[in-house]
Each structure stands twice: as C-alpha cells, then as structure tokens.
C-alpha cells in the first residue's frame, strides 16, 4: 500500500533514479546532497517559503536558496543558481523522494549536464544525513521555526544565505570529518580528523583548478568574520521585525527555538550530536 501511495502518480520516474544508501566516496569532491526545509511554522497549510539546502559531502560546503512554495520550476531554478555559485563541478546530486526533486525536468537536466542523480530509500532520512545535518546547523539554528510566507521575508532570507551565512559557514566554521568507526565489545568508537573549514578542505583536495583556488583566496582575504556575524545578526533582526509586523506584535509563540538566531558553533561532519566550540 505504501508503494502504491508513494509511486502511484508516476512510478516510472522512480525506476529512472537509482537508490543510494551510504556508499559514498568521502574524498571525492562534487557529490551534493539536496533537500527542502519547510518554513511553515505550526501549520503546513497554504503557501509558504521553503529553503533548498545543498551540502557537498567531501568538504562540507553548503549553499542555500529560499523559494516560495514547492513548485518544481522554482526548486529547479534555485538548484541551478546554487550550482552556479559552487566553486567545484557537480558530479552527482542526491535527494530524498520529495516530488520537488523527483521529476522528469530534473532527471533530463542531470542527463544533459552529465550529473549523476540518485535518491534515498523511502522513509530513511539517514541516507541524506549530510544535508540533514546542515538543515539543522545552518538553517533551523539560524532562522528558527517561524512561518515565513511573504515576498519581503523571501528577499531577506535569500540575501542572508547568499551574502553572509554561506560565506560565514564555508570560510570560517570548521567541521570534523568522521575517519573511522570501530565496534569494540559492543561499543562504537569514533575517530575524527583535525577540524577544518569547508574552504580549507576544498583548497587541500587537489580537485579544483589553480584559477578557482586564486578566486577562493581572494574571496577569503576580502571577508571579515566579525563583520559577517554583525550583518547576519542585523538581517535576522530585520527578518524578525518583518514577521512581527506581518502578524502583529505579541502573537509570536514563546517557544524559544522558533525565534531566529545565529549559531556560532562548528559541527562534526556526519555526527549529528556533538558541537565543537570555536576558540
């Protein structure tokens, strides 16, 4: 019954996109996991903003783009914009089974561009664990759980993602990669490498051109993390003010996690539980 419900509208497309679970080469740059993060607040009815979240597996590089609704065309345009900003070639993209991604438009695009396209197993969120982690540390922990559904909010979120949040996370927030996981007497022991930023991992990968390296170095030298942090806080304050103005003051839930704020901790790549404080 679940199979019929899930694939009944267009079963052939699910046969075109192979299922992939855990078999990733974590040293190969260009494998991108994609996902949608809903900003619907306490109600999923009506039209609201969604964040298209993209995480590169080998380096932890992240990009985001906000869209109104879940339309396939808007989601596709967001993905192409993100791909244009990426400082590496996309070799493969991997999504869950959301119809915003599982459609012929994206399948044909992947074929035309020579990009692999795979999907998670049904009801197995851990198959998309890299981007799921970024959804928490980069999206939810930053802009909260409020409902955003206006063009003004959409403009602020996109400006935040492109101009401040992505540079701040990619160039200045180190993450640790899981090197080894061993089971000893029924207990799992994990070993991690030295914390590095996605920028550092990309520069050390040996998989980007010298021209791209110089461009990234120039961007890095032009950035000031303290200034980025101030701008992030300023835009989050503006986003909160627009939300209050839209709904009327005093109507916001007291649930603390709903309110947007910036997270200045770095996180372990593919370990969803342990934050590493930046000193």
Which stretches of residues belong to each language-model region?
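Mobile-element integrase/transposase regions
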Residues: 1-53, 61
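Short, conserved catalytic/metal-binding motifs centered on acidic residues
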Residues: 35, 60, 93-96, 169, ...
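Short, flexible loop/turn elements at secondary-structure junctions
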Residues: 36-40, 56-58, 69-71, 97-99
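Active-site beta-loop-alpha junctions of metal-dependent nucleic acid enzymes
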Residues: 47, 55, 64-87
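Short, surface-exposed basic-aromatic patches at helix termini and helix-loop junctions that form
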Residues: 55, 80-87, 105-119
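RNase H-like two-metal-ion nuclease catalytic core shared by retroviral integrases
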Residues: 95-97, 101-110, 117-143, 156-158, ...
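Charged, gly/pro-enriched flexible loop segments at helix/strand junctions
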Residues: 163-198
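Protein C-terminal end segments and domain termini
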Residues: 194-207, 211-215, 219, 225-279
